[in-house]
Amino acid sequence: MTLLSVAQMNSQDDIEANFIVIESLVQQSKADGAELIVFPENFVCFVGGKQRETAAQFESLQQRLEQLAHQYQIWIVAGTLPCPFRPDGSIMSDGRVRTVSLCISPEGTQARYDKIHLFDVQVGDVVGGYQESRFFEPGTDVIIAKTPFGNIGLMVCYDLRFPELALTLRSQGANILTAPSAFTYTTGQMHWQLLLQARAMDSQCQVLGAAQQGWHGEKRQTWGHAGAANSRGQLLAIIENEGTQLITVPFDLTEQIKIRESMPLMQHRRLLQF
């Protein structure tokens, strides 16, 4: 059995202040005996309109996170960072950036996932509408990170609404799905817990949903409720409190194998043509 931690934060626009919180959560996770900690979307800097400015620091921020993983000998799913270049090193010519989730081992970065599904929606909150595609270029590749405790399928926030991605990750060998997120208060209240459990049930993977919670400036409010669901789709734990919090949950690969053998969903799937 392995212990895995899921973080909840209220990140603001002060990178150094956020890093103090990040390190404290790593310390707490390590004290809990966890092998992995998952951070939420925008965990290093949460502010609209500064994507390019933060993206310019991508490599230095990555190095700082690698140093934390090495210092504390823990795996880190580094929420998301804005990045000015694609995985092949090419720069986006239109001024947009990529939303990148890194999986970092104590020895360094092991995988990079660029968020595929962008949040272009109308929400009945103070902000009203969101159009991530104005500022971000979507990724195209499905990514698995191999770890000593199982294969991690990397997802980000809005990706949770698309079961095809979770099922593709499962078909490529994922045991765990990570979903660093910053759900709006409105959409989170409606669907967050449901999505964690639904994607776990669909894929028979353990789902770890790290979350932003609270106010970020005067208009942006996030739902929080960082949580985890097991390979049956049952809720393992969810944070009900506000602000910075951490949960640590068990993951048993042997038990997951038994669940999948007893209900072999992937073998039973039939993609019908209508």
Give the positions of each predicted feature.
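Residue-level detector of high-confidence beta-strand sites
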Residues: 100, 112-115, 179, 238-240, ...
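CN hydrolase (nitrilase-like) catalytic-core segments centered on the catalytic cysteine
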Residues: 58-78, 151, 160-244
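Cys-nucleophile CN-hydrolase/nitrilase-fold catalytic domain and related Cys-dependent amidase chemistry
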Residues: 15, 24-106, 112-114, 184-205
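Active-site-proximal beta-strand elements of phosphoester/diester hydrolases
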Residues: 1-13, 38, 112, 144, ...
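Short beta-strand scaffold segments in enzyme catalytic cores
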Residues: 78-79, 99-103, 143-145, 226-228, ...
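Short, acidic/polar
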Residues: 17-27, 161-167
